[in-house]
Regions:
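Conserved beta-strand hairpin/beta-sheet module of binuclear metal-dependent hydrolase folds
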Residues: 1-51, 145-157
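Short, charged, surface-exposed secondary-structure boundary motifs
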Residues: 19, 94-98, 164
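Short, flexible loop segments at the rims of nucleotide/cofactor-binding pockets, characterized by
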Residues: 8-13, 36, 61-64, 131-134, ...
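Short, acidic/turn-prone active-site loops that include or flank metal/cofactor-
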Residues: 15, 90-92, 160-161
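Residue-level marker for buried hydrophobic side chains located in beta-strands
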Residues: 31-33, 62, 85, 155, ...
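Short, well-ordered secondary-structure micro-motifs
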Residues: 22, 96-99, 205-206
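Active-site HxH/HxHxD metal-binding segment of metal-dependent hydrolases
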Residues: 37-43, 49-124, 213, 217
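Metallo-beta-lactamase
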Residues: 38-39, 130-222
Length: 222
């Protein structure tokens, strides 16, 4: 679904199977955010093609964290010299240890991915557009949120959802760190909240109300 100029949303709505929401930033950027599980990648690419996106022209594959339902399909882009694959440096370390072993809990093998774009907190330019990487751990070590100031679009992965938050009971999870990450994101000017699961939130007032709900109603249970 085309949300706005150059922002495409692919919500995962199948309650019988786990996967994540995926996003594509078009224009000069051509970045796929959170490609999801490998088994569902052909379906995702097919939906993108139906909307006129040349999937062979993808320049970046960026995962908000290394959990299987967000990252596994990145392996399909390894070896493609035209695609850079991004993950936070702490996420890479986690993936090479406990995070990789986590895949076995889901009956999967850890993917072999050549991550040639280690991400760090701070500004980053993608296809001539200015973005910001925010290190937002708590759900998983090395979790990031991608912020596009020009569009006031935030891709928080599994940090915050619509009236909910990402789990903290997976290996490397931390309730206190997740709270810090959410408070950090709440200070941003956001028009589009595009989370890793559940629905998207559009409108600055609605986004702010969601942050307030999570802080006031959900924080006491973290």
């Amino acid at each position: 679904m085309k949300l706005d100029n150059d922002i495409f949303v692919y919500e995962w709505t199948n309650p019988m199977e786990n996967n994540c929401n995926s996003f594509f930033i078009g224009g000069s950027v051509r970045a796929l955010i959170d490609p999801g599980l490998a088994v569902f990648l052909p379906d995702l690419l097919g939906k993108m093609a139906e909307e006129g996106i040349d999937t062979d022209a993808i320049q970046y594959v960026i995962s908000t964290h290394s959990h299987p339902d967000h990252f596994e399909a990145s392996a399909a882009f390894t070896g493609n010299q035209n695609v850079r694959i991004g993950l936070h440096s702490e996420g890479i370390t986690f993936l090479n240890g406990m995070g990789g072993r986590m895949y076995g809990l889901f009956g999967l093998d850890a993917p072999q991915v050549d991550i040639d774009m280690p991400l760090e907190e701070g500004p980053i330019t993608l296809g001539g557009e200015d973005f910001e990487i925010l290190h937002t751990p708590g759900h998983s070590p090395g979790s990031i949120s991608l912020y596009w100031p020009a569009r006031k679009a935030l891709f928080p992965g599994d940090v915050i959802f619509d009236q909910n938050i990402g789990r903290t009971d997976f290996p490397g999870g931390s309730g206190p760190l997740l709270k810090e990450s959410i408070l950090k994101l709440a200070r941003l000017e956001v028009e589009y909240l595009l989370p890793g699961h559940m629905g998207i939130i559009i409108g600055s007032e609605q986004v702010q109300r969601n942050f307030e709900f999570v802080i006031n109603r959900v924080f006491p249970y973290i």
